[in-house]
Structure formats: structure tokens, C-alpha cells
Swiss-Prot record:
One cellular component term from this protein's GO annotations in UniProt: cytoplasm
Biological processes, Gene Ontology terms: translation
Pfam families linked: Ribosomal_S16
GO MF annotations in UniProt: structural constituent of ribosome
HAMAP family linked: Ribosomal_bS16
Homology family: Belongs to the bacterial ribosomal protein bS16 family.
SUPFAM superfamilies cross-referenced by the UniProt entry: Ribosomal protein S16
InterPro entries reported for this sequence: Ribosomal_bS16, Ribosomal_bS16_dom_sf
Keyword list, A-Z: Ribonucleoprotein, Ribosomal protein
Protein name in the entry: Small ribosomal subunit protein bS16
Gene: rpsP
């Protein structure tokens, strides 16, 4: 099954997440099919907090990809902004 979920990056105490499309059997930070955005939970006012490629997200969702709960919240947050 193909899923859209977060892969952690960054350093200790400075998390940074990539929004990726991957096979559900792959590890959290392992192999992925495509990177469709990012989420920076510790962004300040000058930095971008969330960026998602809506075209590619819609493409993968139409192909049957399942969206994780955390990514669904980010999509909802970006649509509201």
C-alpha cells in the first residue's frame, strides 16, 4: 500500500519533517517514492512552516495513496491559510 507520511530529518532537538510518498513497508526515514513537501515545527516568523505540492498530493491520493493523520492535519492547515 502507498502512504503519504512524515519522514524525520534535522538534528537533535531541531526536528524537520519531509512529507513523502512511500510504500507502507518502508522504514520511516527509509526509501521513498517522491517528496511532496516539508513541515518545520520549530520555524520562526521569518521561516516557512509548511509547504506542500497540492498537485502531486492530489495525484497520489487519486492513485489510492493513504494519508497519515499527521499529514492530513497539515493539509487542512495549509488549506485554511
Amino acid at each position: 500500500m502507498v502512504v503519504i507520511r512524515l519522514a524525520r530529518g534535522g538534528s537533535k532537538h531541531r526536528p524537520f519533517y519531509n512529507v513523502i510518498v512511500t510504500d507502507s513497508r518502508s522504514r520511516r526515514d527509509g526509501r521513498f517514492i517522491e517528496r511532496v513537501g516539508f513541515y518545520n515545527p520549530v520555524a520562526n516568523e521569518k521561516q516557512e512552516r509548511v509547504r506542500l505540492n497540492a498537485d502531486r498530493l492530489n495525484h497520489w491520493i487519486a492513485q489510492g495513496a493513504q494519508v497519515s493523520d499527521s499529514v492530513a492535519k497539515l493539509i487542512k492547515e495549509q488549506k485554511a491559510a
